[in-house]
C-alpha cells in the first residue's frame, strides 16, 4: 500500500495526523539535515502502522510517497 506524507520537520513534537485514508501529516522533532528527519519519519510510521515502511519517492522533499509492506 502507498500513502502520501507531508512531513513537518523541526516542529518540536512527534505526531501523526490522518488527513484521509491515503494522506498523513507527520510532525517531526528532527531537523531536515543529514537524513535525520527521514530516519525519524520511518521510525514513527513503523510504530504507527505496525508494518515495515520505506520511502518510495521524495527523499529530499517534505512531501513523500511511502510504501507499507
Predicted regions located by residue number:
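Contiguous, often N-terminal, cationic amphipathic patches that form binding interfaces
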Residues: 1-34, 39-43, 47, 51-69
Amino acid at each position: 500500500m502507498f500513502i502520501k506524507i507531508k512531513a513537518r520537520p523541526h516542529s518540536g513534537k512527534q505526531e501523526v495526523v490522518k488527513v484521509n485514508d491515503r494522506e498523513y501529516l507527520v510532525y517531526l522533532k528532527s531537523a531536515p539535515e543529514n537524513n535525520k528527519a527521514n530516519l525519524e519519519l520511518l521510525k514513527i510510521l513503523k510504530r504507527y502502522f505496525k508494518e515495515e515502511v520505506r520511502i518510495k519517492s521524495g527523499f529530499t522533499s517534505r512531501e513523500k510517497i511511502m510504501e507499507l509492506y
